[in-house]
């Protein structure tokens, strides 16, 4: 689960509840202070060092597809104030982008627009920070399809993918995609670049059905168990 600084949604706060999941980010570079005793950066570095000493890699769950600012009715906390029209994607109106309607392919009120150079640079800088300064070993990207949308559509040759591959720091770390979002044609399992690993929900569903005793699952179970060649032919 994410460790970058996050906020509770206004609706939860109205109900007296707290978001402990972390999928509502507000600062891409900052460790969540509530997870530490006071010196969050120092404590995070110490944690990573000790995990490495124990022979464990550190893979961060990161959320760069949206922020806690939500849609047009949400608060102005960060990116909206800097450049709302640049950092976020918007629905298309009769005469171009409708800046009163944030695109919402994430289901969280807004969608960060990595088709814009400022957004792309922000995310790349944040990733490099976690690798070079915090010494993590890789990332699991929440709703990764959103990061590769250009003009609203998923592009396996997007600027985001190209930049990740060309970056001397990021090209050597582990990259894991959640290969979907809720936007049009948002399910993209098996369509990420070969340098990426993908969360395989077909494996999850098939194994569950097999152990549940559903009929006719033996062949599909075997396919999933040996690597889902039908979904990931580029890796064979």
Residue spans of the language-model regions?
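Substrate-binding/active-site clefts of carbohydrate-active enzymes
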Residues: 2-135, 140-166
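Conserved alpha/beta catalytic core and glycan-binding cleft of carbohydrate-active enzymes
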Residues: 135, 150-151, 156-236
């Amino acid at each position: 689960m994410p460790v970058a600084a996050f906020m509770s949604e206004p609706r939860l706060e109205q109900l007296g509840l707290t978001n402990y999941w972390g999928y509502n980010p507000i600062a891409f570079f900052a460790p969540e202070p509530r997870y530490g005793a006071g010196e969050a950066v120092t404590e995070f570095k110490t944690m990573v060092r000790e995990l490495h000493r124990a022979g464990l890699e550190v893979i961060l769950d990161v959320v760069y597809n949206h922020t806690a600012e939500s849609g047009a009715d949400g608060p102005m906390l960060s990116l909206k104030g800097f450049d709302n029209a640049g950092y976020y994607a918007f629905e298309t109106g009769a005469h171009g982008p409708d800046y009163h309607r944030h695109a919402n392919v994430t289901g969280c009120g807004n969608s960060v627009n990595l088709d814009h150079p400022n957004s792309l640079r922000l995310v790349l800088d944040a990733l490099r920070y976690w690798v070079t300064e915090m010494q993590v070993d890789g990332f699991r990207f929440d709703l990764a399809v959103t990061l590769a949308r250009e003009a609203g559509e998923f592009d396996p040759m997007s600027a985001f993918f190209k930049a990740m591959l060309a970056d001397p720091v990021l090209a050597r770390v582990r990259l894991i995609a959640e290969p979907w979002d809720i936007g049009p044609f948002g399910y993209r399992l098996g369509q990420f670049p070969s340098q990426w690993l993908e969360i395989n929900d077909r494996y999850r569903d098939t194994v569950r059905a097999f152990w549940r005793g559903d009929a006719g699952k033996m062949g599909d179970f075997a396919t999933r168990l040996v690597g889902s060649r039908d979904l990931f032919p580029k890796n064979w």
